[in-house]
Every structure is written in C-alpha cells, then in structure tokens.
Curated annotation (Swiss-Prot):
Top-rank taxon: Bacteria
UniProt biased composition (Basic residues): 111-124
Protein name: Small ribosomal subunit protein uS12
Disordered: region residues: 1-23, 101-124
Protein family: Belongs to the universal ribosomal protein uS12 family.
PROSITE patterns, A to Z: RIBOSOMAL_S12
One GO MF term attached to the UniProt entry: structural constituent of ribosome
Provenance organism: Chromohalobacter salexigens (strain ATCC BAA-138 / DSM 3043 / CIP 106854 / NCIMB 13768 / 1H11)
C-alpha cells in the first residue's frame, strides 16, 4: 500500500486497455480489397473447411477476415467491408466480412437471422 506522500509524488496509473481489433483504428467497419480467398481448417476438436479471405485495408493493414454464411461470391480483387469479431476456432482470424455490403452478396434462401447475412425479406 502506497503512502499519501508517495501518491502525491506519483499518482496511480490507469491500466491501458488493448484493442481486440487494432486494424479498425476505432472505426466500426473498414473497407478493403481481397488479396486471397481460401479455406482453412479449425482447431481441435472442430472439423470443417472455413471460408476466409485475406484483406488489404484502406489504411494499409492486411488482415484475415471470416466469410460467414453458406456460399459466397468473393474472389481476388473483390471490395469488401469488414467488422470486428473473432472466430474462436480459427487462430489469427479477428475480423468478419459484412455480407450484403459492397461486392459481397447476401446469403441465398436465408429465412431467419437475415439481417446478419445481408438477405432481403422474401416475398411471401
């Protein structure tokens, strides 16, 4: 425990919170260009082929971004919007691609949770 005199000389330091998504630079989303679109396998105990793209952002950062939903239309040079949010079973993937924005299409035949996948309301 510090004495009053010590605290007068040198006040307590507040801990600095480290950002989980440094490439966004405090923005909600960032635009970027796909440099590589590929699939990768998750950590144990999961098994799948997860769709991921490498994105060069407008601020110069290059990050890996997860492509959620069933099927996608992304290829090299596609312009995408990314948001924060990591994928727990893919090491190094700390961003998500926003579906239905810029060159990314929404998920086809999606009925529930449509807003998360950029799908329009189906004609009843």
């Amino acid at each position: 425990m510090a004495t009053i005199n010590q605290l007068v000389r040198k006040p307590r330091k507040r801990p600095v919170a480290k950002s989980d998504v440094p490439a966004l630079q405090s923005c909600p989303q960032k635009r970027g260009v796909c440099t590589r679109v590929y699939t990768t396998t998750p950590k144990k105990p999961n098994s799948a082929l997860r769709k991921v793209c490498r994105v060069r952002l407008t601020n110069g950062y290059e990050v890996a971004s997860y492509i959620g939903g069933e099927g996608h239309n992304l290829q090299e040079h596609s312009v995408v919007l990314i948001r924060g949010g990591r994928v727990k079973d893919l090491p190094g993937v700390r961003y998500h691609t926003v579906r239905g924005a810029l060159d990314t299409s929404g998920v086809q035949n999606r009925r529930q949770g449509r807003s998360k996948y950029g799908t329009k309301r189906p004609k009843s």
